[in-house]
Amino acid sequence: MHTNQLVDPFGRRITYLRLSVTDRCDFRCTYCMSEDMQFAPRQQILSLEELYAVADAFIGLGVRRIRITGGEPLVRKNLLSLLQRLGERDELDDLAITTNGSQLAEMAAPLRAAGVRRLNISLDSLQRERFAAFTRRDKLDQVLAGIDAARAAGFDRIKLNSVVQSGRNDDEVLDLVEFAVERGLDISFIEEMPLGSVVSHSREQTFCSSDEVRQRIEQRHALVRSSKVTGGPSRYWQVVGTQTQVGFISPHSHNFCGDCNRVRVTAEGKLVLCLGHDNALDLKRLLRAHPGDSERLRQALTEALRLKPERHHFATDEQVQVVRFMSMTGG
């Protein structure tokens, strides 16, 4: 018999899975991957059936929230078939997707119909040239059209994600908040994760803390702490007089590890117990050596959780903490 929940050595119960369905993306965001990124051969990527087997095992062990990530998850062929199966799982309290928004104009309504409840959409700039510099793609209008389509599709909540960098887009914080407020969206501001080596900028020089961002917002808006809990690392503040909540993801300035309730599985089937550590369990090898053996998979997950570290040790200097890019991990 297997236990019906996953608990790490520090007593934290794991209820949230971030499941990457592809390492591929139609953008090349400077903080996420290199321009000449080499993607994994397709045979190394988990099949949709294998992805469902992983999700099913986690659900059987008490996971109640699943977020589908990438790369860009919406470029994965036949993704809707996986989402429909997950959307039918009554045990799940939440099925969400993180996307760059490029495919949402066509995909928003089918995603909602498949059972996706919440969307996170990356948006680092409202200025066309700056957006193109961040993403290395001139597709801001396409993303904005996708946001409009998502609003029309009737998701429970839509949240924007903005990575803030000093001297690159920190002057747009208020504009991004206004954009969210006008559309009834939430927004999270993110301190850049030190994953992979970047050449486009110096992370030390572009670091912008969540406290700095919040102070800028409070120059125009009153913020009050929110009790909102989504299962992720954001800490939320309500913009007084609006529907908008502002979140802050602060891996550097406000370590969020103490109540970590999540793990990641990469598109290649690696179980990542912590963003800040390279240790990973190869689930793909197990899945392909013992197809259909759900009990063996659950046992492997339970044993792996004994190795989950207490916290990461991210730094803001140029030392690369983890060698994999965010796109390889699952955003």
Swiss-Prot record:
Enzyme kind, highest EC tier: lyase
Documented EC number(s): 4.1.99.22
Transmembrane feature ranges: none
Positions of [4Fe-4S] cluster 2 binding: C257, C260, C274
Residues that coordinate or bind GTP: R18, R67, T98, K159, R262, V263, R264
Residues engaged in binding [4Fe-4S] cluster 1: C25, C29, C32
Catalytic reaction equation(s): GTP + AH2 + S-adenosyl-L-methionine = (8S)-3',8-cyclo-7,8-dihydroguanosine 5'-triphosphate + 5'-deoxyadenosine + L-methionine + A + H(+)
Cofactors that this protein relies on: [4Fe-4S] cluster
InterPro entries, A to Z: Aldolase_TIM, Elp3/MiaA/NifB-like_rSAM, MoaA, MoaA_NifB_PqqE_Fe-S-bd_CS, MoaA_twitch, MoCo_biosynth_MoaA/MoaC, rSAM
Keyword Metal-binding: yes
Keywords: 4Fe-4S, GTP-binding, Iron, Iron-sulfur, Lyase, Metal-binding, Molybdenum cofactor biosynthesis, Nucleotide-binding, S-adenosyl-L-methionine
GO biological process, one term: Mo-molybdopterin cofactor biosynthetic process
Listed pathway(s): Cofactor biosynthesis; molybdopterin biosynthesis
The record's free-text note on cofactor binding: Binds 2 [4Fe-4S] clusters. Binds 1 [4Fe-4S] cluster coordinated with 3 cysteines and an exchangeable S-adenosyl-L-methionine and 1 [4Fe-4S] cluster coordinated with 3 cysteines and the GTP-derived substrate.
GO terms, molecular function: 4 iron, 4 sulfur cluster binding; cyclic pyranopterin monophosphate synthase activity; GTP 3',8'-cyclase activity; GTP binding; metal ion binding; S-adenosyl-L-methionine binding
Pfam families, per the entry: Fer4_12 (PF13353), Mob_synth_C (PF06463), Radical_SAM (PF04055)
Family: Belongs to the radical SAM superfamily. MoaA family.
Subunit structure and binding partners: Monomer and homodimer.
PANTHER family assigned: MOLYBDENUM COFACTOR BIOSYNTHESIS PROTEIN 1 (PTHR22960:SF0), MOLYBDOPTERIN COFACTOR SYNTHESIS PROTEIN A (PTHR22960)
Name of this protein: GTP 3',8-cyclase
Gene: moaA
